[in-house]
Curated annotation (Swiss-Prot):
This is Proline-rich protein 13. One of its GO terms (cellular component) is cytosol. Negatively regulates TSP1 expression at the level of transcription. This down-regulation was shown to reduce taxane-induced apoptosis. The lineage of its organism: Eukaryota, Metazoa, Chordata, Craniata, Vertebrata. Residues 27-67, 75-93 have a biased composition (Pro residues). Its main location: nucleus. Keywords: Nucleus, Transcription, Transcription regulation. Residues 109-135 have a biased composition (Basic residues). Residues 1-148 are annotated as: Disordered. It is found in: Nucleus. Residues 136-148 have a biased composition (Low complexity).
Length: 148
């Protein structure tokens, strides 16, 4: 029969549970980090972790992902962009008015911009104040090629 006084102070024919750490004995609380926590045992260090459907070594061959640059999906899919006809430059997919990574500027405009750039730096170097557009000129960065 189970002793109702087990683990309690007082006359006790059975000594408290000393040899088994991890029990719920107030005199001997369970250790903070038991070597094997109660409950489902974790896999040993050498065991594979992760999804059993995909072994830890990875799939034997890489799975192609459709739409990934550099990987054309197999099947009757049309290419994302039709190849340009020979001799015709590819059409810029950006909407008109949007600035792309490389804006093509004609030689006249380039010269004009270089001049303005030099002027701006010179202006900022010599004047301590009026740095931020107190005397702003009406030159905008639109690519309208005016005749100079």
């Amino acid at each position: 029969m189970w002793n109702p006084n087990a683990g309690q102070p007082g006359p006790n024919p059975y000594p408290p549970n000393i040899g088994c750490p991890g029990g719920s004995n107030p005199a001997h609380p369970p250790p903070i980090n038991p070597p094997f926590p109660p409950g489902p045992c974790p896999p040993p260090p050498g065991a594979p972790h992760g999804n059993p459907a995909f072994p830890p070594g990875g799939p034997p061959h890489p799975v192609p992902q459709p739409g990934y640059p550099g990987c054309q999906p197999l099947g009757p899919y049309p290419p994302p962009y039709p190849p340009p006809a020979p001799g015709i430059p590819p059409v810029n997919p950006l909407a008109p008015g949007m600035v792309g990574p490389a804006v093509i500027v004609d030689k006249k405009m380039q010269k004009k911009m270089k001049k303005a750039h030099k002027k701006m730096h010179k202006h900022q170097k010599h004047h301590k104040y009026h740095k931020h557009g107190k005397h702003s000129s009406s030159s905008s960065s639109s690519s309208s090629s005016d005749s100079d």
